[in-house]
């Protein structure tokens, strides 16, 4: 997968290129990540990248010419088929389903805003889609871009090593993840559930699914609004609720 980022702070993306899952994927050639700094496309000795908004008001906007030229340079490097995304509070909220859709795109160019944002005409002429990571204010688009890159990269074949890891993540099937345990078997008086020690793979699968359903029911019940539960899921959720109401049955 090819990724381009338009940012005033390219050094921030070392968190993506040098560390963790994405760093390994880049090293192994599964991902490419390139950055373009609008400051490199300025024509004044101060390398100015901000400008006053028409109509007045507080703050500044990113200057049009350096930003537009940086996007064009990224498009040229990407070649045909690149999708330009602006990280914006007005955009579609990123979910696991959205990340899966974006992972099917082979080339993404992410535009990171700063100051009070960018000129609306840049959005109209240069941007294909706007995406948001949530309803809160950040200082720029870099952290949302890194979040999107990490979420999408995990879905690129080979990045996680085992595709099952991505398939079992929270939200991959619309549900929260089940609880996980490692050694020791007993920790401060709390025991690993016996089913996980028994070695019966089908029992373990059902337990994990039931816990996933139950955790979603308790913590994010609104997620069920977009799900059509199977007969097995409906039965396991009912068991979870029954056991929660009657602990002696568990």
From Swiss-Prot:
<keyword id="KW-0489">Methyltransferase</keyword>
<comment type="subunit">
    <text>Homodimer.</text>
</comment>
<dbReference type="GO" id="GO:0052906">
    <property type="term" value="F:tRNA (guanine(37)-N1)-methyltransferase activity"/>
</dbReference>
<dbReference type="Pfam" id="PF01746">
    <property type="entry name" value="tRNA_m1G_MT"/>
</dbReference>
<dbReference type="InterPro" id="IPR002649">
    <property type="entry name" value="tRNA_m1G_MeTrfase_TrmD"/>
</dbReference>
<dbReference type="InterPro" id="IPR023148">
    <property type="entry name" value="tRNA_m1G_MeTrfase_C_sf"/>
</dbReference>
<feature type="binding site">
    <location>
        <begin position="133"/>
        <end position="138"/>
    </location>
    <ligand>
        <name>S-adenosyl-L-methionine</name>
    </ligand>
</feature>
<keyword id="KW-0808">Transferase</keyword>
<comment type="function">
    <text>Specifically methylates guanosine-37 in various tRNAs.</text>
</comment>
<dbReference type="GO" id="GO:0002939">
    <property type="term" value="P:tRNA N1-guanine methylation"/>
</dbReference>
<dbReference type="InterPro" id="IPR029028">
    <property type="entry name" value="Alpha/beta_knot_MTases"/>
</dbReference>
<feature type="binding site">
    <location>
        <position position="113"/>
    </location>
    <ligand>
        <name>S-adenosyl-L-methionine</name>
    </ligand>
</feature>
<keyword id="KW-0949">S-adenosyl-L-methionine</keyword>
<dbReference type="InterPro" id="IPR029026">
    <property type="entry name" value="tRNA_m1G_MTases_N"/>
</dbReference>
<dbReference type="GO" id="GO:0005829">
    <property type="term" value="C:cytosol"/>
</dbReference>
<keyword id="KW-0963">Cytoplasm</keyword>
<keyword id="KW-0819">tRNA processing</keyword>
<dbReference type="InterPro" id="IPR016009">
    <property type="entry name" value="tRNA_MeTrfase_TRMD/TRM10"/>
</dbReference>
<comment type="similarity">
    <text>Belongs to the RNA methyltransferase TrmD family.</text>
</comment>
<protein>
    <recommendedName>
        <fullName>tRNA (guanine-N(1)-)-methyltransferase</fullName>
        <ecNumber>2.1.1.228</ecNumber>
    </recommendedName>
</protein>
């Amino acid at each position: 997968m090819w990724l381009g980022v338009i940012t005033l702070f390219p050094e921030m993306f070392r968190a993506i290129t040098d560390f963790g899952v994405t760093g390994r994927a880049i090293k192994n050639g599964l991902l490419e990540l390139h950055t373009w700094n609008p400051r490199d496309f300025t024509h004044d000795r101060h390398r100015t990248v901000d400008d006053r908004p028409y109509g007045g008001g507080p703050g500044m906007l990113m200057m049009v010419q350096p930003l537009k030229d940086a996007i064009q340079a990224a498009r040229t490097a990407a070649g045909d088929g690149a999708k330009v995304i602006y990280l914006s509070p007005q955009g579609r909220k990123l979910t696991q389903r959205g990340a899966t859709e974006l992972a099917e795109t082979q080339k993404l160019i992410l535009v990171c805003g700063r100051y009070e944002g960018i000129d609306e005409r840049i959005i109209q002429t240069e941007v294909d889609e706007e995406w948001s990571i949530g309803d809160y204010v950040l200082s720029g688009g870099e952290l949302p871009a890194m979040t999107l890159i990490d979420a999408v990269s995990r879905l690129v074949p080979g990045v996680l090593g085992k595709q099952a890891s991505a398939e079992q993540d929270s939200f991959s099937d619309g549900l929260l993840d089940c609880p996980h345990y490692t050694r020791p078997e007993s920790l401060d008086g709390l025991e690993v559930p016996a089913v996980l020690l028994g070695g019966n793979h089908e029992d373990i699968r059902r337990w994990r699914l039931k816990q996933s359903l139950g955790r979603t029911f308790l913590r994010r019940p609104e997620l069920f609004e977009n799900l059509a539960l199977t007969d097995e899921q409906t039965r396991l959720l009912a068991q979870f609720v029954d056991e929660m109401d009657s602990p002696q049955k568990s």
